[in-house]
């Protein structure tokens, strides 16, 4: 049994081996033919073997593994030999996705905090000591010192010539200062007896009437001594005589005195007789200012300052790039003739200097301006003036107390009243020599009585009875009441020159006199020596860069004396002048009795008294105060504040003579210069209206302080109160010195005298619209405009002189007159300050600029929603074309806000170094760069061939409502289109929303602190060029801010009753009042100090601008360079205060397109573009509205494909619904755009010759009327002065007409038309465009009528001593205009000054012409499809659905059941059968049909039958192939069986669709668009064919959805066998449509091998589309 069993087992083993071998052979495909009979035979044996194997087969099978030794099967075909395929297997886990699309550019980072100021630069070497600087400008007047003790008596003056001197008569000296009222003197000697007058009508003595005004002055007596005539009646006061010439007058001839008149009535107690020269009296009040003295000697040089750090001497280098303004360098060594530096800013006012010695006596000054009336406080009584002319007889005095005087002599004097006004000197009565009487006892000073009402002039009293027995003195009567001040007497003969009185205390600052004619320009002063610069942070440097315009500076040194201006109005009567007998000042004597009537003395100072009778009609007075504001008058000259000239730098190479510069505005107040040579005396003006106030004493001029050392720039001080106007200084010589650190703007000085009008400057580069500054000081009065239409009735004028009539009721306000013709064009103002090199922050919306040239039409934008009309702006400059970004989603326009109030003025950036004065602007600033779309994936892009064909132009979208006008961006040069990136998600909301509707404008608040510079928002993509918006309706005028501190003057009251009191002591300087709310819009305010520079925005290739280095020494002036390029716009600053509209600069040439800027996020939607000029595209046919199917379940989102080729542009869809405004995005990080490197900014060229005069700007709107000044004393009208600074901003003028339409932008490149794109999500609200520049100013309003006269009875106290310098006050209100300077002699033209600091950035020039189109960039790849749009609004109900029975099968290629696409219904789910192979023949299923989705899975889903009615299942070497999932093969590569197969088999769904379904293939990596009228079901990869065992397989119809698999896999199917196993085998191939470029269609294909990770880059994309129903 054993051997037999062994044999059996051996046979069995052999059979098994044979079966195994054959099975292997069969598995490996050895049986190539269809008739493998041997195989069948062996197979039979094999079956027997199987039945005989229970359990043993596996054991035996292991030896069978030696099969590889047999050479039968080619080793690589089936999986056993596939070990090297392991990496491939890993590949099936999913190849790496295509490179992700680049993310959106990050938002720009939030700008960092302002850094602290950098440390000061390293000090340079010490320079050699410069030459002596020019004399510094006189310091501000020191505070008045306390009055010094009376000086010693001066030398006695030379006696004047006495012509016609009556022998024996003494000439009177000039009037001394009034002494303290003496005690009543003892009665004088009796006067000579007068002749007996005719008896008067005796009336009962009435109560004493108030003193009447003095009667009119009598005629001057003839000039020879005639016989004594009867006493004449008092003559009528003549008008003030014309002032004599202002030469130093010799004493006049003494006119012979007329005969003595009859004896007058007893006078008031006369002045004390001349005693010995008394002790000097107390210091009287300061007399009127004398005429300006001759120019003083040049002061001794100041103490040289410490040496500054020397600068390194610079050679003339090539023009370097312009650095940012560095810290001030030390002074350089002056080698040869260096160019003169600019004169520094005013230093801080020095401490008051010590009171200097009195200078030599100057020529008589021109009469000072009347001080404002002092407040009545009891002053000390002045010494009696000369006796006035004899007045007419007053009312009868009180009856004397039985004092018959002896024989007509004076009655016994009553107790002395308070001193009367000075009488005219009496005639000498032939007394050969008047001996001075003894001084009377000093009377107690009376307090001033209340002023009585002005009485009528009494009739002449009766002549007193002659007193026969009047030899003895009568009893001393009680003191009479104080008489009224006497009339001004005729001018007496000039007395002998008295000693110089002590200077009085400073008087109050007088009201501004009328503006004199402009003096001729003075000759240039001698050249000063350069000052030294001391680096001391606390001291203000000499001139830094020009500060922002400060308050008008103090007047410069006096020019050579100009001709006399027109006669000013007579000042108010001053305090008694200081004409005394020459000699030492005695102590005031007591009041003597009145002497006999002396000769007519020189005119006493004007007395203060009641108004006399109405004189003859005077010449026309000055205009009264402003009337009610009329329509705005013509625009005055634009005033500019010119900084004080710094010391001139070293002489530069002489430039060619420029055109005459424009007249500068007032500079900072200079310290008062030395008095100029006296001008001629002006004619006497008309008497003013109203009671003259008492003049305040004139203040003493302080000595000039030493020049302060340059300080480091301090923080800007508060604006000080305006100082007193100084006299016009002489022009200093240019100093030689280096510019100091830029100081802070000094405290506003006293308004200087206005400079002459400058010649018209060349147009500066237009700055960005500045904000309106606070009102400047009242400028010089502008030229009279043409008469306006009759304005509304003014308020009642001040009552004329005379008894006030009954006040009529004020008339009602008349209607405003119609608009007058535009005023005469003002002269061009100075060019603005040079701008910074670095562009400042972008301002808020500028005012409307002039209309740009019309750009060519851009492509039509999507219609925006109707915005509210914006304020009419001028069209901005045309921007250059930005990089062509991927079109952003259309944003809905936000609601347009009404224009907000002007924002606060942003800080100025650091001043740039001096730029040259440019010719009229070259190209304008580059517009903001739009955000480029996300860059597409640029892998494997042939940049040369990327650009696609130009498509047809899309249909013109509907014109949307006009959105707010965006600023027109300058077009960038077209960038190379990147591949279209994936549509990004909607960007973060732009930083700035549209302004909401503004409420009614609130009162303007005080300016807030300057905010730090905001972060740079993402630049929006440039909107398409909007149609210029319709000019908005005129905004509601803001409600006027509260008036500033000073209210308008009220209507003049009736003249007060009473004599104006004496001047009170000067009150202490009041604290600065709280700032009023800002008045109506003022002139452009002075620029703030530059803020710390904002962080520079990211810029293109050039690095950020470094911190400013220390400035080098000034190089020699280079030749004029070309204008530097515009700087990159800085971060947008806060809005500055609105400036008044400057004159419009000439249009710049159209700029070249700028380079691209930083890509930002999508900007706000641009306004409606001008319709494009492209040809209209063909309209797509509209599909019929089908019946609506049921909504299917949403499919799973496919993974994004590789970016497809950009499809043709579809027709423009209708505007999407308005999206909600997004939240503000965080600032993105700058993304480097395609912008080429921008060269560094060139050095600014030297100033070009002034360009031709630009066309006149449109007249600005008149500013509001400034506060009324105090009523000036009316004078005769002066010659019209130079045009004043602009007044305060008037009410808004009548709305300007719309700006000229901007030039049409160049035509954009036509877009590439594609298929109709799917509707994207509504874009987020873009950033609101900048407000257009300010509209064209309206026509000039009519000139307002003069305001009502100010009150004329304000009595001003004397100034107190100045307190210590307080902290700078808030900026004061606009001071009244200073007096008009006298016409100076025209100076010779000075050397050209050094180049100014660069002005502020001009407004962008007008848009340059569009550059030629660049060559078209290569066509970008189309971006991947955007995410699905938001669901559309609900459509109309469809027609009832009909089951059409169209089936589509969708394969998930995962283990999840797929969802049917939207619009289809699920019928069932199953497993994805690809094809089956039986009997070595394959038959495939169309994956798009239901046959490919079997509801059940089996590795052998079929059986085979023969004609013998025998069927076999799972009995042969047959296969089934199923779509597989990404499940990776097991590492062992062993076949998978059982339930482990489940994860490998794809699931499918059969869906019923309402319409035909088909697949479209792009044969590119772009996803094709569905044809019009078809909608997308899914996108995928174009699967064509597959083969596996025996090279059998099948394919897909490309029109079938089965040819578009949603997942690409190199092995998309798995092979399963009847024996229950599945696996991937190396002979399985999948075939996919490849990508074909158009240019490669008829060329030999280039072989290539793609590895994992790049497979998808050459597989065609497809989309399954369903016809819309």
Curated annotation (Swiss-Prot):
<feature type="modified residue" description="4-hydroxyproline">
    <location>
        <position position="606"/>
    </location>
</feature>
<dbReference type="GO" id="GO:0061304">
    <property type="term" value="P:retinal blood vessel morphogenesis"/>
</dbReference>
<feature type="compositionally biased region" description="Low complexity">
    <location>
        <begin position="377"/>
        <end position="387"/>
    </location>
</feature>
<feature type="signal peptide">
    <location>
        <begin position="1"/>
        <end position="27"/>
    </location>
</feature>
<dbReference type="GO" id="GO:0062023">
    <property type="term" value="C:collagen-containing extracellular matrix"/>
</dbReference>
<dbReference type="GO" id="GO:0007528">
    <property type="term" value="P:neuromuscular junction development"/>
</dbReference>
<feature type="domain" description="Collagen IV NC1">
    <location>
        <begin position="1445"/>
        <end position="1669"/>
    </location>
</feature>
<feature type="modified residue" description="4-hydroxyproline">
    <location>
        <position position="603"/>
    </location>
</feature>
<keyword id="KW-0325">Glycoprotein</keyword>
<feature type="compositionally biased region" description="Low complexity">
    <location>
        <begin position="715"/>
        <end position="731"/>
    </location>
</feature>
<dbReference type="GO" id="GO:0005576">
    <property type="term" value="C:extracellular region"/>
</dbReference>
<feature type="compositionally biased region" description="Pro residues">
    <location>
        <begin position="1413"/>
        <end position="1428"/>
    </location>
</feature>
<feature type="compositionally biased region" description="Gly residues">
    <location>
        <begin position="621"/>
        <end position="630"/>
    </location>
</feature>
<feature type="compositionally biased region" description="Low complexity">
    <location>
        <begin position="234"/>
        <end position="247"/>
    </location>
</feature>
<feature type="modified residue" description="3-hydroxyproline">
    <location>
        <position position="210"/>
    </location>
</feature>
<feature type="disulfide bond">
    <location>
        <begin position="1505"/>
        <end position="1511"/>
    </location>
</feature>
<comment type="similarity">
    <text>Belongs to the type IV collagen family.</text>
</comment>
<comment type="subunit">
    <text>There are six type IV collagen isoforms, alpha 1(IV)-alpha 6(IV), each of which can form a triple helix structure with 2 other chains to generate type IV collagen network. Interacts with EFEMP2.</text>
</comment>
<feature type="compositionally biased region" description="Gly residues">
    <location>
        <begin position="586"/>
        <end position="595"/>
    </location>
</feature>
<keyword id="KW-0964">Secreted</keyword>
<feature type="compositionally biased region" description="Pro residues">
    <location>
        <begin position="1247"/>
        <end position="1258"/>
    </location>
</feature>
<feature type="modified residue" description="3-hydroxyproline">
    <location>
        <position position="1214"/>
    </location>
</feature>
<dbReference type="GO" id="GO:0048407">
    <property type="term" value="F:platelet-derived growth factor binding"/>
</dbReference>
<feature type="disulfide bond" description="Or C-1604 with C-1665">
    <location>
        <begin position="1604"/>
        <end position="1662"/>
    </location>
</feature>
<feature type="compositionally biased region" description="Low complexity">
    <location>
        <begin position="994"/>
        <end position="1003"/>
    </location>
</feature>
<feature type="disulfide bond" description="Or C-1493 with C-1551">
    <location>
        <begin position="1493"/>
        <end position="1548"/>
    </location>
</feature>
<feature type="modified residue" description="3-hydroxyproline">
    <location>
        <position position="602"/>
    </location>
</feature>
<dbReference type="GO" id="GO:0001569">
    <property type="term" value="P:branching involved in blood vessel morphogenesis"/>
</dbReference>
<dbReference type="GO" id="GO:0061333">
    <property type="term" value="P:renal tubule morphogenesis"/>
</dbReference>
<comment type="function">
    <text>Arresten, comprising the C-terminal NC1 domain, inhibits angiogenesis and tumor formation. The C-terminal half is found to possess the anti-angiogenic activity. Specifically inhibits endothelial cell proliferation, migration and tube formation.</text>
</comment>
<feature type="compositionally biased region" description="Pro residues">
    <location>
        <begin position="367"/>
        <end position="376"/>
    </location>
</feature>
<dbReference type="Pfam" id="PF01391">
    <property type="entry name" value="Collagen"/>
</dbReference>
<dbReference type="InterPro" id="IPR016187">
    <property type="entry name" value="CTDL_fold"/>
</dbReference>
<keyword id="KW-0037">Angiogenesis</keyword>
<dbReference type="GO" id="GO:0071230">
    <property type="term" value="P:cellular response to amino acid stimulus"/>
</dbReference>
<feature type="modified residue" description="4-hydroxyproline">
    <location>
        <position position="623"/>
    </location>
</feature>
<feature type="cross-link" description="S-Lysyl-methionine sulfilimine (Met-Lys) (interchain with K-1651)">
    <location>
        <position position="1533"/>
    </location>
</feature>
<dbReference type="GO" id="GO:0030020">
    <property type="term" value="F:extracellular matrix structural constituent conferring tensile strength"/>
</dbReference>
<feature type="compositionally biased region" description="Pro residues">
    <location>
        <begin position="784"/>
        <end position="802"/>
    </location>
</feature>
<dbReference type="InterPro" id="IPR050938">
    <property type="entry name" value="Collagen_Structural_Proteins"/>
</dbReference>
<dbReference type="InterPro" id="IPR001442">
    <property type="entry name" value="Collagen_IV_NC"/>
</dbReference>
<feature type="compositionally biased region" description="Low complexity">
    <location>
        <begin position="847"/>
        <end position="875"/>
    </location>
</feature>
